[in-house]
């Protein structure tokens, strides 16, 4: 379904009132965007994507099929969410003692250009650093530094990646072979040379 706001919504998708969707965004089959959600421009939401109440999604974000972005999760610009990856938003869920409402949610922030592989799980209350790469099937239970490469269950850092997601190494002075990145105090900084 095309609309006056210059974004595309498939006829099977549901967009609740008070959801805000940016221009040139595409929302595909059987997706549901809940009230108060904000989705930026140029995003792509695959089939069966659920975006919860009051979720904030930046510009140029790609969310693959079968992903739920629950209330309490924020995705900055250029984030990639692989197929069937999982966000949680409550640390100790109990059916007998419902925990509805934002006061129970632990916030999760996925920073600019981070990528999360298929079937990965991001446990709530953590921050995924910019340009970080989370391997398929990983379970992230703690904060992830910028440019970190994480794999496994629980997710362990096995290296560093550049802005393009290619693994990089560092010499004794903490410089990458290309000279564009510096590792200091277990933090990678971009030197602005690319």
Regions inferred by a protein language model and the residue ranges of each:
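P-loop NTP-binding/switch modules centered on Walker-like glycine-rich loops
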Residues: 112-113, 130-131, 141
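Short cysteine-rich clusters marking metal-coordination/redox-active sites
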Residues: 162, 176-178
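Flexible, glycine/small-residue-enriched loop-and-beta-strand segment within the central core
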Residues: 3-5, 11, 16-21, 26-127
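Conserved catalytic segment of ABC-fold P-loop ATPases
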Residues: 129-132, 145-147
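Short Cys/His-rich "knuckle" micro-motifs
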Residues: 170-174, 184-187
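Conserved beta-strand-loop-alpha-helix hinge in the C-terminal portion
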Residues: 147-166
